[in-house]
């Protein structure tokens, strides 16, 4: 028996004895962590000064932020799962936009949490290391710790201002993929589009603390969310 043949037989035996990377099957729980970026595709109405009407060219925009993203998938069957997206709080600057405010800079800021639940479909057989998936579901966004800047306060000629953003319910869609490096550890990349719409209410106050004006603006934030990270299957 030649040495080459012996090595070939040995290699085949080792490969046969090595455990196959089993991807996902019913009952599996997959947790992922990584960098998640919320990148708003924002647009707004004109600011509406209550009792007066719209202020033409007074609009706002929302910038992006990156935080620790956490996702989970529970396999209901070998190909259908429930997924959840969570993260540490995102912080966004709210900037002036439109013909009247485009150069104003930062007017306010807010933090938000965007928990999102989706039903996911994994089309590949569970023996495949590469597991792409798509999903659709719902998002709830909670806004908190909203603050205005002196720039906004000076722009409206008030002694002080505040802002409050309504929470949002909306649809969500996702596409992503896991690649299994071992039986349990993999890498992941995913993208979501989330429907986030809110109404911001701005209050202006005089030196005595009395409210002298109220303004409202509708903002469609509608972000793309990008995440790259690692996964672990339990």
Predicted feature descriptions by range:
Residues 91, 95, 182-234:
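Predominantly the C-terminal beta-signal and adjacent terminal strand-loop region
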Residues 60-66, 109-114, 163-170, 218-222:
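Short sequence motifs at beta-strands and strand-loop junctions characteristic
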Residues 152, 156-176:
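A contiguous pocket-lining binding segment that forms or flanks enzyme active sites
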Residues 1-27:
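Cleavable N-terminal export/targeting peptides
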Residues 54-58, 100-108, 156-163, 212-218:
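Extracellular loop and loop/strand-boundary signature of outer-membrane beta-barrel proteins
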Residues 28, 39, 71-150, 221-234:
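Gram-negative (and chloroplast) outer-membrane scaffold detector with strong preference
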Residues 43-51, 93-103, 144-157, 200-207:
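Outer-membrane beta-barrel translocator domains and adjoining extracellular loop/strand segments
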Residues 22-69, 233:
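Short glycine/proline- and aromatic-enriched beta-strand/turn motifs that initiate or cap beta-hairpins
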